[in-house]
Amino acid sequence: RVLFRSGDQPADQPAERMQDISPEQNPLFHPDKRRCCPMPGCFAGPFCPCCPP
């Protein structure tokens, strides 16, 4: 779970909402690369797995 310092996250956007993001909504998502993200983008979060080398 990603922790936010107080003030980084609006009160109406709790951190739990981040877990609802699908890979398609990840800005680093590449639909033309077999539903994966090239490095280093795939290290930005658990929503977009690294593409195989």
Curated annotation (Swiss-Prot):
Primary residence: secreted
Keyword field: Cleavage on pair of basic residues, Disulfide bond, Secreted, Toxin
Top-level lineage group: Eukaryota
Residue span(s) of the pro-peptide: 1-34
Subcellular location: Secreted
Cysteines paired by S-S bonds: C36-C50, C37-C48, C42-C51
A cellular component term, taken from the record's GO annotations: extracellular region
Tissue distribution: Expressed by the venom duct.
GO molecular function: toxin activity
Domains (record comment): The cysteine framework is III (CC-C-C-CC).
Family to which this protein belongs: Belongs to the conotoxin M superfamily.
Any further remark recorded for this protein: The mature sequence of Reg3.4 described in Franco et al., 2017 corresponds to the mature sequence of conotoxin reg3l (AC P0DQO8).
Protein name, UniProt field: Reg12l
